[in-house]
């Protein structure tokens, strides 16, 4: 309809796909199949059409008889094979990928066994895989296209298949004279081969020496790709995976150090490679080098919405290593971003309704839901409140309000996991992808957990419980609600996160939150002891004020409510005990210990300060009642009780001072020779020199970052001691 086309702004292909989608929603799969088959003759490389065709075909075969099923599948196969045979389509990937996709869907849906493919005029999928490599090896996407179909290659077929690919590349090399330093089609063919080795699990069989020899080869190939950042990035990514294997599987700190040296060299020579920068963020975060992580994150061209999807790369990291001020600034910026995004999407939604653009409404609503319920957004809000209350805000009432947050409860079960782990590509479509999915689910649980067991909820309930003690309308009922929830949550966490539990340490993994270190140690015990005392004091306060009888105010009852000094001392000594980790690239373990202890002791200080406020209110009420009673004056009674609280505060301050001493001691270790590992001798001379040239800069960056963490924590210690004395 020419009149309709004149007034409709959308392209015809877009409208055609929308029409097919509506037919599918209506269940009219026959029409979708007919129209898709007809349109594919004109647009064989349009993957949306293939998707519509396959979805409707396999929705139909479930409900039709065998003869009709055979006719339908024959029709689909005929369309695919006719397009493959068309000479004009030789360089179009769509029909070839459609052929492989059809076979995969036939097998996965148990429609046809792979041994019966010839009944549909289809052949061995391995032949189709090799044909695809032969036709499209020069395209950077070749391996990515093939990855979903690698499961067709059985274990006993891997060697023969790889030999065929190797022979093909050898022929290519003989046919083409490679220009030194230039990326050619032969390089891309070799990249397909190297990726296949990784994807088919051949790297797992290599020894440490063989893996470093493979890295040597990758480095030399990077040197041959001086004109292509993309080709160099692929080789660098392969090398990084090999070195990460050595580190993650064998705890080889040398390999992690070599990975950092290698990627620093790659980024200098190929600055437009974002993958190497992101992998470097992962490597540096693994050893607590936060300054470098921040530097690379700032340098990356992160798109607006990627601040959410890639937020996991730095979430929880800065405060983990004592960079509290930097963490507060980072989270405050992210909070502003999420608030602004919600506002803008809401405005777009309103505009869509006003303009009658109703097709846009469902997508905008979905997008708004994903942004507003993003677990990174919720986590950022919680961390901002926690860190600000502990290390930034001075006024007690403002601290209480900050920790308490909104009245509206957080729906932890309804949060959206928007994390994009695909930003660091995975080579293996099966085993590695399975581990990636396991890691995503487990880290999602650790941070926002469907089973009520996560670091976010723990922080949230802890803050609510602490804030409830100091609220002007504090009641035992309100405090008990949060405290009971916190107790249940802590117990559940202890059952779920054992001390010896470890997450899959994949290259794509987010920085671990070390939740088990918090809940399975005296750190959490100290806070629970203080909160239990706070609950008892609040109960005593309610009893005294409601009775209006001054005799109820006596030091024995209040002293019984306060924490036992000996018990507090034992817990503080245990949690602040020195944890100096020795060995190459282990320094960050000490920093993490000091940082976590400071966060716990800061919460402990806040609880003591709020307890003091409650006691002041009790004695203020007592003084307002009039007469003296007994041998002690009211002020003397008050002093007896507050002296106990002073003893507890002194013990907590001793813990803070102990951490300060540890920080001063470990600062001297930054000059130690065993802080940084040596480069392995398994590389040849050329590669060894490349890594050696990066050593001075990398070493100084690591030491500088650790120094920054120590200095930041020492400033925090000074503030905590000053606040305690105020």
Feature names for model-found ranges:
Residues 259-266, 297:
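Active-site-adjacent structural elements in folded domains
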Residues 287-317:
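Catalytic binding pocket for nucleotide-activated donors in carbohydrate/polymer assembly enzymes
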Residues 1-260, 307-726:
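Non-TPR docking regions that flank or precede TPR/alpha-solenoid scaffolds in eukaryotic proteins
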